[in-house]
């Protein structure tokens, strides 16, 4: 009797360890009745063999949206079906035998006599084997890109802005995704002309570049982007949201802002649109992000067809549209393929407190220029300050920066790089053949030179100003550039030019006695296009071409601080 009770307890332990997947009735001993027999319907279990019909419940690639097919490897959407059934080791039976002190099933059956036979001690396969969840089946283009960073050259698809907008219904709700690092160059002008402001929600991604935590994001960063979008396109400030798809910042605020029904996510390629949707979908379903949402990649135009994602409550639907590309490919026309990933890695600014001035974020030493020397930023941009200018510059983009004795020397290194400078450039060797010459209109203080799809470079002239010449910029013709009054003046608290009693301070006393404030966007222009100029015009004549004056010395005396400078020669039409 005692031995039978021991066996009953052992059966109960085995049953509990197997998570209730088999009942005590299987063993037939006196433990019968101690556990409720589980309800099991073998017809509901998933088959281990995966058929093509079950895999193609959704005929589109869940990563890029293209229609899947298995017959033509050289055509678009080709995918490989997974191989056959996988063998599963019977760990539960092994555990049961160990708990019974290695007593074989036949011996155990003899001890229990007529109450049980050896076959009843074998656990049916369906009881311990979990149904296999099909893996995401993706096309070979996505698979190779995400796992091996390989580019399929046979698939080159450009998505102009108007082509993407044509897929959006006229009464739709639109989420316009913009990147903070090249803001506002990704702004769709045609979108604003086609749809009402009430239909558009603006989402600023990659905001974590400026802030170490999401608290600073909302406290000091939101006002700048709200003011800018109101000024440029008449946006509703209540429908401007700052997020970080990588860190899951601002997702709750975004979901509470979006109206019910379908919301079409629109943005330039590689603005973080698909990453944002993956974060939202993954958070909603409480699963890993890799199991939900669209695929992400450093390749341009990775999403190729509209993809719909319904949230759990079924009242909100996210539609991921393909990213629209810059005319003629933009920066990707000139980039080497092995450097596609580099331009997405933006340097993180060191966290600033309210007691630190934004100028402290310029670590480079000032350099004196002679009017001929140039700074080359990865071969994408060449900066030539005028003679006598002392310039501090800091590149927030992950690109190599080199100084050359002249523009001719810099381009010759790009076209035929020596072994020591083979990594000085991220562009193709023929990119200098399409250089266009620009000038920055007169400015005062810290500015950002913004490169579309890449990031920005901070420029700060120090010392006496050159009032007769302008800073010249050279870049390949299809790379879009602009200048903005430095974003750091507005997303961080800075020192004002007056103290707590509103007395105007001398420059040297601003840091010590200036009142700490968060600046709002002024009425003056804070964005401007670069002015293209002929390549053969002497540098000393460029100021006259832009301003109509040959010297700004008298005008310069009127303003003591950069915040007072009116930027009267700036042109904001690039953003309108």
UniProtKB/Swiss-Prot annotation:
Record-linked Pfam families: MMR_HSR1
Family from the record: Belongs to the TRAFAC class YlqF/YawG GTPase family. GEP3 subfamily.
Organelle transit peptide: 1-49
Keywords for the protein's UniProt record, in alphabetical order: Mitochondrion, Transit peptide
PROSITE patterns: G_CP (PS51721)
GO MF term list: GTP binding
GO cellular component labels: mitochondrion
Protein name per Swiss-Prot or TrEMBL: Genetic interactor of prohibitins 3, mitochondrial
Compartment list: Mitochondrion
Lineage of the organism: Eukaryota, Fungi, Dikarya, Ascomycota, Saccharomycotina
Disulfide bonds: none
Keyword Mitochondrion applies: yes
Domain of life, source organism: Eukaryota
Role played: May be involved in the mitochondrial lipid metabolism.
Limits of the CP-type G domain: 162-327
Organism: Komagataella phaffii (strain GS115 / ATCC 20864)
């Amino acid at each position: 009797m005692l031995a039978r009770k021991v066996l009953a307890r052992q059966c109960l332990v085995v049953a509990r360890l197997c998570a209730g997947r088999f009942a005590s009735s299987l063993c037939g001993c006196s433990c019968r009745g101690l556990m409720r027999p589980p309800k099991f319907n073998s017809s509901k279990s998933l088959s281990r063999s995966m058929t093509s019909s079950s895999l193609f419940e959704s005929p589109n690639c869940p990563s890029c949206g293209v229609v899947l097919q298995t017959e033509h490897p050289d055509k678009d959407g080709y995918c490989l079906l997974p191989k056959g059934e996988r063998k599963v080791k019977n760990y539960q039976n092994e555990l049961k035998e160990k708990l019974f002190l290695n007593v074989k099933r036949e011996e155990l059956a003899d001890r229990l006599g007529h109450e049980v036979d050896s076959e009843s001690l074998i656990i049916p396969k369906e009881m311990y084997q979990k149904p296999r969840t099909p893996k995401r089946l993706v096309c070979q283009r996505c698979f190779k890109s995400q796992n091996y960073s390989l580019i399929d050259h046979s698939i080159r698809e450009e998505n102009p802005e108007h082509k993407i907008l044509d897929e959006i219904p006229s009464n739709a709700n639109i989420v316009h995704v913009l990147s903070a690092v090249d803001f506002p160059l990704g702004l769709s002008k045609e979108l604003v002309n086609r749809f009402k402001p009430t239909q558009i929600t603006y989402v600023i991604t990659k905001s974590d570049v400026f802030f170490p935590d999401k608290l600073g994001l909302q406290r000091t960063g939101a006002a700048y982007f709200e003011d800018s979008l109101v000024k440029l396109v008449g946006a509703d400030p209540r429908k401007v949201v700052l997020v970080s798809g990588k860190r899951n910042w601002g997702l709750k605020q975004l979901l509470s802002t979006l109206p019910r029904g379908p919301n079409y996510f629109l943005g330039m390629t590689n603005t973080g649109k698909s990453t944002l949707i993956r974060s939202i979908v993954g958070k909603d379903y409480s699963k890993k992000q890799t199991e939900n949402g669209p695929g992400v990649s450093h390749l341009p135009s990775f999403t190729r067809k509209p993809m719909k994602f319904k949230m759990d409550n079924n009242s909100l639907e996210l539609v991921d549209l393909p990213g629209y590309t810059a005319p003629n490919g933009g920066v990707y026309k000139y980039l080497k393929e092995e450097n596609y990933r580099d331009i997405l890695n933006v340097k993180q600014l060191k966290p600033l407190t309210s007691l630190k001035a934004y100028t402290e974020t310029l670590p480079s030493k000032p350099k004196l220029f002679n009017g001929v020397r140039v700074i080359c930023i990865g071969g994408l941009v060449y900066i030539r300050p005028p003679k006598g200018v002392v310039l501090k510059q800091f590149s927030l983009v992950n690109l190599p920066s080199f100084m050359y004795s002249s523009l001719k020397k810099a381009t010759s290194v790009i076209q035929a790089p020596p072994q020591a400078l083979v990594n000085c450039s991220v562009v193709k060797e023929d990119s200098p053949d399409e250089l266009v010459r620009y000038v920055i209109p007169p400015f005062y203080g810290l500015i950002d030179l913004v490169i579309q799809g890449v990031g920005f470079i901070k420029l700060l002239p120090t010392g006496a100003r050159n009032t007769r010449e302008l800073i010249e910029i050279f870049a390949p013709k299809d790379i879009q550039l602009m200048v903005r009054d430095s974003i750091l003046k507005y997303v961080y608290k800075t020192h004002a030019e007056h103290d707590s009693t509103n007395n105007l301070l001398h420059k040297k006393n601003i840091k010590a006695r200036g009142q700490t404030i968060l600046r709002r966007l002024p009425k003056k222009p804070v964005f401007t296009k670069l002015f293209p100029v002929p390549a053969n015009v002497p540098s000393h004549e460029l100021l006259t071409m832009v301003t109509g004056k040959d010297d700004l010395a008298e005008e310069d005396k009127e303003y003591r601080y950069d915040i007072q400078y009116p930027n009267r020669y700036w042109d904001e039409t690039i953003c309108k």
